[in-house]
Amino acid sequence: MEVRTCLVAAGLVLAAGTASAGPIPMDTPIKLGNVETVCTGIGEGKNDPRWRTYPVRVELVDASARYIAGAHVSLSDVTGASMAEFDCSGSWVLFRLPAGLYTVSARLTASPVTPATARFQPPQTGQTRIVLRFPAQP
């Protein structure tokens, strides 16, 4: 009986934590807690008309504004509480999330350059474009 109680308690602690995933599949919407996200931006997948319905599009670019693929992405709310963390193999990350003020941060998986961060609010209509620009690699 004690083992079952401990397992239930451990499950509740995990459920209360950050919604996280390892690498998420390309061009496939997934739900992480209150956040729906899509990793895309490569090849024909980026032209899917569904992606225009997402209110937030985060683009990963280098110092010359060329798309970069592959980053560990973190999303937090206005209090700094982590809402989602995952690895994206694409150069775009789309979000559908409740109204509010958020911070998105990305760290390139194949480079030691400084992470890029931006604060944003989802628009009431349309799509906002957030560009995370990474400095030139050393």
What is the meaning of each model-derived region?
Residues 77-81, 97-100, 122-125:
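A short, structured loop/turn motif at beta-sheet edges
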Residues 100-106:
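A short tyrosine-centered beta-strand micro-motif
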Residues 79-90:
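Short, acidic Ser/Thr/Gly-rich low-complexity loop/linker segments typical of extracellular
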Residues 1-8:
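Bacterial N-terminal signal peptides that target proteins for export
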Residues 21-71, 75, 108-138:
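Primarily secretory-pathway and cell-envelope proteins
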